[in-house]
């Protein structure tokens, strides 16, 4: 009887002690009535879990960033390069000037000219100020009569058609005195893809027109890729009017890229940069980092703060020529990061909102 009492007391004590131990599981009792305590599980501290999650996320971001950088570098490396003479070296601490042309293909070339990448109606000097910010864009109409070195007086587009980018750079440098540091060409065959990549672009048209069967109404028009090209290449317009539309299209496209940060947003950067690089040809002196930097700086040309102007012209003996009384101030303004100041002084040269 004493043995039974002792055994019962011992079991009761063990049971009581077991109740006090963390981790006992009453449901784990064996058929003999014995209890097997489950191992104690240490609670993970929330901050440790957060660190693990954060570390994994950062690792993923870095991997994506590294892959994105490699892909961007691949895109930039694939941009065609062209040898261009007469380019001025970049002076440290000073601004840079780029000559942009737009290769023209399709039914709107002047009679007798064969469509080629060396025919352009758009000649745009884009200036980056010494502080790295976009200074503005200056368009010289392609049908302006200028002195083409070694060829006499011809429309500006003649220089590009006859001697390629080198003669175009030489001609504009001779006429303006502005050193040109780099050259880039936009291929209108790929403008549609670029416009589609940014989700279309809005332009304002002063009166209803029709081009290639596409009707454009007066006011704001939302253009897709193909309709943007139709808008810029309308054969019913004069060459000067088409040049103005191309200038407006470039301005409004860059405005959307810059204002919506499409080149810095990871969700849009690759598609936009892919379309942009597909449309570009640059001079062989431009490094990949310079091309990437240029793409970002071009975004700075977007918005109301951007300055787009057209060189002043006048008719002399029925021919379109530059107006030196005004344009000489413009050339000086480009060299001294003063395009905005020039535009304020000569508002009539500012590119209109509607074209």
Predicted regions and their residues:
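Amphipathic, coiled-coil-like alpha-helical scaffolding segments used for oligomerization/assembly
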Residues: 157-217
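Flexible, polar/acidic helix-loop-strand segments at domain edges
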Residues: 93, 193-275, 280, 355
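Entry/capping segment at the start of metal-dependent catalytic domains
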Residues: 3, 38-132
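Extracytoplasmic
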Residues: 93-96, 118-123, 132-140, 151, ...
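C-terminal solvent-exposed extensions
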Residues: 79-81, 106-107, 114, 144, ...
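Second-shell loop/turn segments in exported
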Residues: 109-113, 154-162, 177-182, 233-241, ...
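Sec-exported extracytoplasmic/periplasmic mature domains
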Residues: 130, 145, 161, 173-177, ...
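Terminal targeting segments of Actinobacterial cell-envelope proteins
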Residues: 1-51
């Amino acid at each position: 009887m004493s043995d039974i009492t002792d055994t019962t007391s011992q079991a009761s004590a063990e049971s009581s002690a077991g109740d006090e131990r963390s981790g006992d599981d009453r449901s784990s009792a064996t058929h003999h009535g014995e209890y097997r305590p489950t191992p104690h599980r240490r609670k993970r501290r929330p901050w440790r879990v957060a660190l693990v999650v954060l570390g994994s996320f950062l690792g993923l971001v870095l991997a994506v960033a590294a892959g994105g950088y490699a892909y961007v570098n691949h895109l930039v490396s694939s941009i065609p390069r062209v040898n261009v003479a007469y380019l001025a070296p970049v002076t440290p601490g000073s601004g840079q000037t780029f000559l942009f042309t737009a290769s023209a293909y399709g039914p709107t070339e002047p009679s007798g000219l064969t469509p080629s990448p060396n025919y352009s109606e758009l000649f745009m000097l884009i200036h980056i100020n010494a502080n790295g910010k976009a200074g503005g864009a200056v368009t010289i109409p392609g049908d302006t009569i200028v002195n083409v070195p070694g060829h006499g007086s011809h429309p500006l587009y003649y220089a590009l058609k006859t001697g390629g980018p080198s003669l175009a750079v030489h001609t504009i440098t001779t006429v303006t005195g502005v050193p040109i540091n780099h050259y880039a060409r936009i291929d209108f065959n790929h403008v549609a893809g670029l416009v589609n990549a940014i989700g279309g672009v809005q332009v304002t048209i002063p009166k209803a027109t029709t081009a290639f069967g596409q009707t454009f109404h007066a006011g704001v028009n939302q253009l897709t890729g193909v309709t943007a090209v139709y808008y810029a290449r309308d054969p019913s317009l004069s060459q000067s009017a088409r040049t103005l539309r191309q200038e407006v299209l470039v301005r409004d496209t860059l405005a959307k890229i810059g204002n919506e940060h499409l080149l810095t947003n990871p969700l849009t950067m690759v598609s936009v940069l892919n379309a942009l690089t597909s449309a570009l040809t640059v001079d062989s002196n431009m490094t990949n980092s310079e091309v990437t930097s240029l793409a970002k700086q071009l975004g700075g040309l977007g918005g109301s703060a951007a300055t787009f102007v057209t060189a002043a012209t006048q008719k002399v003996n029925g021919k379109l020529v530059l107006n030196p009384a005004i344009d000489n101030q413009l050339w000086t303004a480009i060299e001294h990061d003063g395009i905005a100041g020039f535009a304020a002084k000569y508002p009539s040269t500012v590119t209109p909102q509607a074209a």
